[in-house]
């Protein structure tokens, strides 16, 4: 299955030396982490508040208990393991073929797979800081805390993830844009490209090959040299580095 698509992608990868991968939630669903927008994703489940409300800056400040109840249960998957897509991208970087991974995910699975140059547009569950004194806490501290995690100084610990109503980290975005603009091949995977401003990043690509691998269609399919509607792990698994 997908032999023809894998073969076409292989030709493009063999012709590339500066690949950048731009990925979203679909990259991690094969590791057992639900996405937000698919039919069985978080937006289609019933909650007292919508996910957009809960994971917003103002909601976090007003209702930290409700925020953390949702966040720990629905956004922290500490047992998840990298899948073939994460592993193959790390291999491509080690082989000197991949410049960077630009991800909308917050799970840290790319780094767990061995990727070094990862630009996390929406932050990471693995970085958490006290809002009062700035002390760092890891994901285990958050997950194992009772209710709202507090620092030893008494301040509330906040995850370093970009909530609704918050801006992206300018340092990260600049590096991501630079990598995309330097790429000879851009592989877009596991994202429907509906989250802005992150989705607008791909407009900075002016290289040779644009590839889209996603289970459903995306807004960028039109310009793609190769479009594969399939789970990304199954495709990347068949690639030779």
What are the language-model segments listed below?
Residues 1-241:
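Conserved catalytic core of sirtuin-type NAD+-dependent deacylases
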């Amino acid at each position: 299955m997908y032999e023809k698509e894998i073969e076409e992608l292989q030709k493009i990868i063999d012709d590339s030396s500066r690949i950048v991968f731009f990925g979203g939630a679909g990259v991690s669903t094969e590791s057992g982490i639900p996405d937000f927008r698919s039919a069985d994703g978080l937006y289609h489940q019933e909650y007292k508040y919508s996910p957009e409300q809960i994971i917003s800056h103002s909601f976090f400040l007003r209702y930290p208990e409700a925020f953390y109840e949702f966040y720990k249960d629905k956004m922290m998957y500490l047992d998840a393991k990298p899948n073939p897509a994460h592993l193959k991208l790390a291999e491509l970087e080690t082989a000197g073929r991949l410049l960077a991974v630009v991800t909308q995910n917050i799970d840290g699975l790319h780094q767990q797979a061995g990727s070094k140059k990862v630009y996390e547009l929406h932050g990471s569950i693995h970085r958490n800081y006290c809002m009062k004194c700035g002390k760092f806490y890891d994901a285990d501290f958050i997950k194992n805390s009772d209710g709202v995690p507090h620092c030893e100084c008494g301040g509330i610990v906040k995850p370093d993830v970009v909530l609704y109503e918050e801006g992206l980290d300018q340092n990260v975005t600049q590096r991501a844009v630079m990598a995309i603009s330097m790429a000879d091949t851009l592989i877009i995977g596991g994202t429907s490209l509906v989250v802005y401003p992150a989705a607008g990043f791909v407009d900075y690509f002016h290289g040779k090959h644009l590839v889209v691998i996603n289970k459903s269609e995306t807004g960028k399919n039109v310009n793609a040299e190769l479009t594969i509607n399939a789970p990304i792990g199954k495709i990347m698994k068949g690639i030779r580095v």
